[in-house]
């Protein structure tokens, strides 16, 4: 939440971003306003210096309201380094920043199929300016959340499925592999 009236920005899987206002009122009516639409399955959102960034399945999008009318006029491709195929399960989830302003998100693997692109089942780091990205760790089936701590450590969850019976939370280490063989690439990933 941000701003004087404690408003929130919310994204939906259907491709919309909404602003919710009135959250600071003890009782009363919330106001919902759709400000952006047409994005590819956005499942992560981060506000940095009053600018909304949205993590979509195909890219991180920076939203611009050029004429201050409360609706987005320009959808900027901030970074689209991560690759995606047509498979239904390849969600890109969450969007967090570290103390230096770099972005982090989780990229799901192909459900019950081997990975086709290097980003399947990975945690991705994107530079503050959006010019480059790195795969931090992989071995995830459906990572559905990332938490970045002030000390630089971070965690990511992974959803249960046919390979693990419960959701779990992982302390993420650089170049770590977290067990889901559908995102394993021989010669790249640790034995």
Language-model segment annotations:
Residues 1-191:
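Beta-propeller domains with acidic blade repeats across secreted/periplasmic ectodomains
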């Amino acid at each position: 939440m941000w701003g004087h009236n404690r408003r929130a920005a919310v994204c939906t899987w259907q491709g919309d971003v909404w602003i919710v206002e009135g959250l600071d009122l003890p009782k009363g009516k919330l106001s919902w306003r759709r400000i952006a639409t047409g994005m590819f399955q956005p499942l992560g959102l981060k506000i940095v210096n009053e600018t909304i960034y949205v993590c979509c399945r195909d890219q991180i999008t920076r939203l611009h309201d050029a004429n201050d009318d409360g609706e987005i006029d320009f959808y900027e491709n901030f970074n689209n380094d991560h690759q995606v195929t047509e498979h239904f399960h390849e969600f890109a989830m969450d969007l967090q920043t570290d103390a230096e302003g770099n972005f982090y998100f989780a990229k799901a693997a192909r459900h019950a199929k081997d990975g086709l692109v290097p980003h399947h089942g990975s945690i991705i780091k994107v530079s503050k300016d959006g010019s480059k990205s790195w795969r931090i760790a992989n071995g995830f089936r459906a990572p559905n959340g990332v938490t970045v701590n002030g000390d630089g450590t971070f965690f990511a969850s992974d959803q249960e499925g046919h390979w693990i019976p419960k959701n779990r939370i992982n302390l993420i280490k650089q170049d770590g592999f977290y067990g889901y063989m559908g995102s394993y690439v021989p010669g790249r990933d640790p034995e």
